[in-house]
Structure formats: structure tokens, C-alpha cells
Amino acid sequence: MLRGMKVVLTTGNPGKVRELKEGLAPLGWTLLTLADFALRMPKEEGATFLENALLKAAYVAKATGLPALADDSGLEVYALGGEPGVYSARYGGRATDRERNVYLLERMRHLKGEERKARFVAVLVLAYPDGHAEAYEGSVEGVILEAPRGEGGFGYDPLFYVPEAGKTFAEMGLEEKARYSHRGKALRALLEAYKDGPPPREVSKLE
């Protein structure tokens, strides 16, 4: 399990940092953030969540000499061809979560019922300074509401309704959200892999 191992979280998003710290707590790792280092992060130019997560994790691991964990995640609306996808954090060039939510609702105003189905996807990449990297993924199906509900969470959480739970992510606390969320599922996959120590590299490495 490597309790006390220092790992750098490569996101500056406070919501993601909070959920990652909560989810990784059982491992006993010492979690650092980008605020602990003077790094200029590379642009996220990957075409997939995996490419972006690998880019961030590998860069930070090499720059700091420490293992680095990157989270690249986003919302995919089926009727919009997978938008916003890898552009979730900068959708439509909007600057804030609220503006992006409004923009998404505008893009979906003609969609009803089944046409509003969507999913959240999360890819975690844990990269080591020697170049080894591992990926853990999670996804959750849901529906985009026609108006926001709830005060918690971040990003598109107020719009993403989880039928199984009967509420949006923004209506859930951290623990409940982790049970259902894409990030929670990816974190559980990582926890399972590390429950008896680091997984065999020939099994866990990214091809």
C-alpha cells in the first residue's frame, strides 16, 4: 500500500482535489498539490481523457521527481455527439461553471426525454518519475435536467441527474456522490489495485 508515499495531484480544481483526497484517504499517501510547486502546466491538447491525463501526470512526475496522479474527466451528451467531452472545462469558451451550464442548456433546449441522456467519464493516470504509468477509469450514466438542482458539487453537477439515486450530483454529499460518480468508480479501481501494495508493472502499465 506504501503508506506515506508522496503523490502530487495534478489538478488545480478545488472540487476535484477535495474528492481525490477523500477517495485516496484509505491508502495513507501524503498528497501534495500543484500549489506546492512552481510549475507551468502543459496545454491539454489530447483528443481523449486518457491522453490528457497521461500528459499531465507524466509531466508532473518528471518535473517533481515524485509520483503524480492526474484526473481528466468530463461530460458526454449523446445527442450532441459527445459534447462537451474533453472540452468540458472550457465549453463554448465560457469562463465559469454557471456560464458553462447555461451554455449547455442552450445547446440542449430542443432535446427532450431520452434525448437528454448523458454520461460522466473519469480517467485517472498515476505516473512515476521513471516513466511507468497506470490508468484507472470510471463512468456513470445519467440525464441532463432542464434546470439546475442542488447547491453542492461543481461543474455540471447541478444538471446531472442520476436516476438510480433520484437526485443530481449537486444534491449529494461527498460520500454519496462517491458511491455513484465516475471519479468514485475510478478511485475504487485504483484502491483495489493498491490494496496489497503496488500492482505488478507488467499488468498495470499503459501500453
Curated annotation (Swiss-Prot):
Protein EC: 3.6.1.66
Enzyme class, broadest EC rank: hydrolase
Pfam short name (any one): Ham1p_like
Cofactor: record remark: Binds 1 Mg(2+) ion per subunit.
Superkingdom of this protein's organism: Bacteria
Residues involved in Mg(2+) binding: D72
Gene Ontology biological process terms in this record: nucleotide metabolic process; purine nucleoside triphosphate catabolic process
GO molecular function: dITP diphosphatase activity; ITP diphosphatase activity; metal ion binding; nucleotide binding; ribonucleoside triphosphate phosphatase activity; XTP diphosphatase activity
Catalytic function, reaction form: XTP + H2O = XMP + diphosphate + H(+); dITP + H2O = dIMP + diphosphate + H(+); ITP + H2O = IMP + diphosphate + H(+)
Family: Belongs to the HAM1 NTPase family.
PANTHER family in the record: INOSINE TRIPHOSPHATE PYROPHOSPHATASE (PTHR11067:SF9), INOSINE TRIPHOSPHATE PYROPHOSPHATASE/HAM1 PROTEIN (PTHR11067)
Protein name: dITP/XTP pyrophosphatase
Native source organism of the sequence: Thermus thermophilus (strain ATCC BAA-163 / DSM 7039 / HB27)
